[in-house]
Amino acid sequence: MSLKDRFDRFIDYFTEDEDSSLPYEKRDEPVFTSVNSSQEPALPMNQPSQSAGTKENNITRLHARQQELANQSQRATDKVIIDVRYPRKYEDATEIVDLLAGNESILIDFQYMTEVQARRCLDYLDGACHVLAGNLKKVASTMYLLTPVNVIVNVEDIRLPDEDQQGEFGFDMKRNRVR
């Protein structure tokens, strides 16, 4: 086997066949049926693959799950529980996502994580929030509120103490000093 043949096989492995994207065409092949064919309809031997259907099925299941979570919250108007979590490592983010998938609200405080770890964890939670159609709101410099789709968070324009100092200090203040 030459190098060219190996290379061609490698390319063929990763390319899509044009045939698979075309709709299924019925061919004039004989269909074998049993003696009791009047009771059961005959099925063709070759059936198209179900890969395109599974993607649409996953999307519809996601929408159904989101609606199910919204309906559950409307039925259960008892007490609302907000879990408070202090993650110390990145692996704690999966537990937080499990709580969100269970239709619970979580207040997350990243004070025990480094800034790099907290950013990485927050990116993971933000992605999970988009998948589960939740809400992620910053409520303090190191605290975030993660809520499911059925919880509405009304946050006024909060100015955090750290943001006030950084927002007011600028180059204009240096120029306006009186000596």
From Swiss-Prot:
- The protein's predominant localisation is cytoplasm
Q: Which residues form a coiled coil?
A: none
Cellular localisation: Cytoplasm
Compositionally biased intervals (Polar residues): 33-55
> Where does it sit, as one GO cellular component term?
cytoplasm
Task: Return the annotated region ranges for Disordered.
Answer: 22-55
GO biological process: one example: FtsZ-dependent cytokinesis
Q: Tell me the Pfam families matching this sequence.
A: SepF
Q: InterPro entries, per this entry? A: Cell_div_SepF (IPR023052), Cell_div_SepF/SepF-rel (IPR007561), SepF-like_sf (IPR038594)
Q: Is the keyword Cell division assigned to this protein?
A: yes
Domain of life, source organism: Bacteria
The UniProt keyword set, sorted, is: Cell cycle, Cell division, Cytoplasm, Septation
Asked if the keyword Cytoplasm belongs to this entry, the reply reads yes
**Which family would the database say this protein is a member of?**
Belongs to the SepF family.
The cross-references to HAMAP family, in alphabetical order and at most eight, read: SepF
What quaternary arrangement does the UniProt entry report?
Homodimer. Interacts with FtsZ.
Its biological function?
Cell division protein that is part of the divisome complex and is recruited early to the Z-ring. Probably stimulates Z-ring formation, perhaps through the cross-linking of FtsZ protofilaments. Its function overlaps with FtsA.
Q: What is this protein called?
A: Cell division protein SepF
Give the source species.
Answer: Streptococcus pneumoniae serotype 4 (strain ATCC BAA-334 / TIGR4)
